[in-house]
Amino acid sequence: MNTEKVAFDIISLAGDAKAELQKALKLAREGKFSETDALLEKASEQLQQAHKLQTQELLTREANGEKLQFNVLISHAQDYLMTTYTLEDVAVEIISLYRLIKK
């Protein structure tokens, strides 16, 4: 797979995960925790897929001696993936707080 396709796939998966996390936060605020949990799981799966792409298609190839062309698109994909991972961490904590408040 070429690096441009990998970058777009990572961005797409991370973007979908981010949208699911934002929905999960909204539903948690409303006390709809079963729906929230399903969205958190879906987001986690999307992030795992993006991470797998990053590892198999970029990092492993580079580690095996292939010289990948660096470009802004790859940088954006990496950044978007990592910021979405951060959002996931924060969302899980905020949702835990909503669970306590809604008891």
Summary of predicted features, one role per range:
Residues 1-103:
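Terminal alpha-helical segments
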